[in-house]
Amino acid sequence: MSNPNQAAKTGQTNDAQNPASACPFKQPLIGIIPVRYAFDVYDDQGQALHPLPKADRQWKGQFSIKQRSYTLRQLRDGWLYVYDETAKTLHEYEVVGCKLTKIDWSDDEANKPTHERGSKGESKSCLLYPAQHTLSIGYAHQRWTWRVCEHMRSNTSSRHAVMRKVSLKQFESNGTHPHAHFAQYLEDYVADIGTPAEQDIFKDTCTPSLPVEKSEEAVKGTEFKFVADKAVVSSSDYLQDLPEQNCGLFVALNDPLADVSDLFVTFTTQVAKRTKAIGDETQQHKMQMAELTRTLGRIRLEEKEIPDFVKQDPIRILELERAITEYCATAKLAEIESHHLASEGHSPSGNYALMQQQAEQKLAELKTLYRFEPTSAQMRKWRKKDNSFIDEVRWADLDNFLVEHYTELKGLDEQIKQHYAQFMSAFNQLGLDPLLFGMDNQDEVQQAYLLALTSQFLVVVTQVNHDEKSLEILKKDLSFDSPKNLMALASTGFSLQANQAINNHIQGFSTAFLSTSNPSDMVAFATAIANWDTFTGDERIQEKAWFKRWIEPAQSSFGALQKAVANQAKESWQAVMELLFPYQNQPKGGTPSLLANLRLLLVESLVREEAVLQHNPKYAAELKQFETKLNAILQEMNDALELKPGNVSPKNHQIATAQSAQRKLGQLLSSELPMMLTLKNQAAMNTFQQSVNEKLSALSKNVKTSSASVSQKLGGLGGLLFALNLWNTMTVLENIRYKVAQYPSWNPFKNPALGEAIYATGNTIVVAGAISAGRAWVTIAEQGLLDRTLKNALNTTKVLGTKDALKTFAKSIALVATVGMIASALETWESWGKFNDSSKTDLERFGYLLKAGATGAQGIIFYIQFFTLLGSGIGGPSIAAISAGWMLAGFAVIGIVYLIGVILTNVFKRSELEIWLSKSTWGKESAHWPVGKELTELEHLLHRPSLRLSQVTQRKAAQWMDSGSLQWQLELTLPDYLKGQTIGLQITRLPAQPAYYQPQREAVTPILINEQQGKWSIEDNQPVYRITLGGSEKDTVGVCVALPLRWGKELSLKFYASGTRAGELDLQSAEANDIATRNLVVGKG
């Protein structure tokens, strides 16, 4: 800031525009104060804070940006260049604060590094040049290299494009000049001169007005000061060195990098606001779960179905969805009501139709408030939607959260789009030649600067584009084929000539014969690469003829880029290449895409020494040897895993043989897979090597004996009941080994799987014992022994058949009562526990209460029956009391109550998805799961694969007495998102034990199936995998499946199942380390 003496020195005694005063420009030298155009800032009402006079049309910045206007600001600290068109000399000044320090050049500056050029001379607050001269003045944030200085000095068109031409003679003559004005008005026109320093109105720009002492800490340690403050000063600080009080003018220069950076800072400020509004990871997860819950529990409209006046307001869309959901639910109830009224002879539209009236009222609200009326097609589609989730969610809390969230975000997305469009418009207008804003792409430091700058731009630009349309536009802007801006040229050293050279060289490669569909074509392709003379040999690429033809003209820019990447810009280069890759890579198959992607490899080869590619001249021979070894190992695995009809079952050593072959395969793929193109740097090459280290594990399973139905042998209702209970027992015991393994306790009261198995088996025994007791009861009743005690009847009866009937009756009742008490106690305990489970619906819990009461009462009857039997055996109650009529009546009533309970638990049972929703973030019974667990639980439900066993013919009948043989076929159906991905799969088959007796029976060993032999198909847009397993249909099949998560590919869902019957297998979830699988590509084969 100026002191009183400086202010007095610059006091205005002459008015340059007053014809009666002495003209201050009648001096040999005129003072010139350079300032710059900068985008203005705006208040909350959108009004510019420092607009230039609208009537004065001479002020015009470099870029034409909608909704943005220019003001004037001080120059950033940097460099100023003045070419005296009259004297034909170029001068260099360093800009620091409000001081311009002249750099004096000697005669040998051309060979010096840029930072060592010249020596500091006199410092003043303005430029001083003869009043009759014409000047070209230009600003540069980065110091011009000598190449740029020579170019600007010799190239008139570039000089006029980059520098501001100022005719001092013209200004002296008429007092006007484009982009210039009298120095005395400096404070009136320049926004950050004379403004109170505490009002940092430019904080969201690349040059905030913070005091110097604060900003020095903020930028300390940064290599390139992309954001650096410029302290506010008074006009006297600039006017103090004028040759005569008002003998001076200020001239506005262009600073295109500052303009672009200002727009970028404003743009990122809006992005930061949105990020803050979205919140932390927890808040974002709540938002994600809210949207998911809306999708599950409410009717969501497609974008084209939403009324136009509602589309732009997410809160109105939320209200519309809620209204439509309520209307559809009411309309469904009205339809049920209508059928009910019609069945009773009432008119469905009369006073009885209350739900119909409510539905009509809600439809009228939809038409009035939202101008929306559902079509019949929409109603049919929505009726299919499961609305059972509605009662599981805290909708009021969810709606309040969304309304609050949308309110915070309101307008931010539109502002981000607006500021993004402004930034991209300016950046595209910046052009493709760094020379036009004073940057030298042949200089290492300036290459590093441009890489650092564009990497920052790319980070944000590539993150804010999400919809398909904006991504397509961005891909065109960043195209390698036809670049629109410098970000697209970053990979070729910001040189359009280098970009065109790469493209021309690639296009010169003949594509007529190339195909990559089979190994022989790959050999032809490898030969073509070698003949192309691009990647071959041990010579450096720069020595190739094609390089001298195409790249040598742009070799200096590549050399500078290579040095920058090797030194200070390594991280920036990596960031730029990673960010550009999705937009410059060609993901589609075919030769054109392959050739297009070779450009990126070629660029890496030119820039990074460790990325230099070399062609493998022995590729064809190595590929042939690899195929021979691969086929031999696969045959070895096939022989060990796949039995041919008639062969003896494999012994233990065959599993070891398969494991050995698998290890050989892994070693072959990891160490001997031939590479057509390799990196010379071995450390870098290792990142491309993939090793296969799959662990083989046989899934063992205890032998299970199948039982045939005995209903025909037992006959009647009792036989049928026994068969049904036997089937239920087999169903429960099917996967008991795996179910029990989920619980650490062997206490049946603590282990539901074990308890279920015991009481299911017990009920079967009870029914079988009751059948036996019933037959004996008939014989006892015929002999008239029911009124006697069991002891008396046994002692007095002489008939052998009657005595056997009494003994059978006693043993059967003892078995029935004992097992019945145990089974009833276990089932009562389980039902009572489920009754206390708050995650179940009220009616489902009531059903379990009925079951608990019924089984508890049943247990009491068994208890009484058991002790009545004991009493009758010692001379107490009669035989009739052991199986009294009230007991039979009790069992009948209990059966009805139990049946009602079963119906309630099945009809009103919550689905797994309903239970998950009730325990999720917005559920009424939220379990407050961690983020990962909540999403994983959902993936288990939504993307659970389907496994099915079916019987197929293994060997056809050879003659009339030969019925042939069957084998299992496994069918695996996967979610559609897994197409082309790698899953884990392991299939084992446990042969059935021989039915005939063997004195020394060998242990049955599971057989590992080669999953690569299966076939894929697409059915209903889902991948379906089928494989025949060999053996017989009596074998037990075990399957382990590992699927990558949709939201996190590094994690996986794991399932296992086993079965011995045709039909769908029961999949069980497994912990990550519980099962072993082998890799299988979905859809390949």
UniProtKB/Swiss-Prot annotation:
Function: Toxin secreted by the type VI (T6SS) secretion system that acts on prokaryotic target cells. Acts in conjunction with VasW, an accessory protein to VasX, to compromise the inner membrane of prokaryotic target cells.
Region (Disordered): 1-20
Main localization category: secreted
GO cellular component: extracellular region; host cell membrane; membrane
Membrane topology summary: Multi-pass membrane protein
The protein's name in its UniProt record: Toxin VasX
InterPro entries reported for this sequence: Toxin_VasX (IPR048126), VasX_N (IPR046864)
Coiled-coil region list: none
TM region positions: 753-773, 813-833, 860-880, 884-904
One of the Pfam families matching this protein, by short name: VasX_N
Subcellular location: Secreted; Host membrane
Signal peptide: none
Inactivation phenotype: Deletion of vasX gene together with deletion of vgrG3 fail to kill Escherichia coli.
Keywords, ordered alphabetically: Host membrane, Membrane, Secreted, Transmembrane, Transmembrane helix, Virulence
